[in-house]
Amino acid sequence: MAGSDVKVTAISDEVAADDDFIVTASRPNTTATLANSSFASGGARKIQVTTTGTGDNEKTNTIIGTDVFGNTITEVITSTGSAEAVSGSKFFKTITSITSSAQFAANLKVGSTSDAAQEVHGNRVRLRGYSIVSGGSAGLVQFFDGTPEDGTEIFSARTIGTDNQTIDNTIPDEGILFPNGLSVVYTVGTIDRMNIFFS
């Protein structure tokens, strides 16, 4: 439309969860060697630490990286005394470093979960509408004012779980204001593509 100030952010994310995408099996004394530091989708993921030993209760891994808007964030993931996976709660777009509090009893690996987030726009915007192509599973797409960690969920949409079926919605009047920037949270496999319209 001529003269329109509406912009669009396109999100396509079918990158599966991978439990050793960031750190493959190793026993770092301090800082781990990173196999990868960002995701092919360009988005952010929750981080998961998996241990194989049973003597690692209360040992920690400190994750440093950036959030959906590129700001520096830190999270400490504490392992248990069992050989198991422990997931964090923050979304990392990039990973700068992972540092262990002590050497683990056996190999550990660090990867990503299927919980994902993406930036739509980092500044004040008005949401005008969205088009979501569903994946093979139903799930929520949550719209946050600000980051998922520190912002506020304004509303959510639900995919229908039928692969390649599209949901289109236009926000009436002046749209919905996101004064602290707009980000979305979703589960991989519930969306194939999203076009999010804002001004």
Language model features by range: what are they?
Residues 1-199:
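Surface-exposed, low-hydrophobicity beta-strand/loop segments enriched in small/polar/acidic residues
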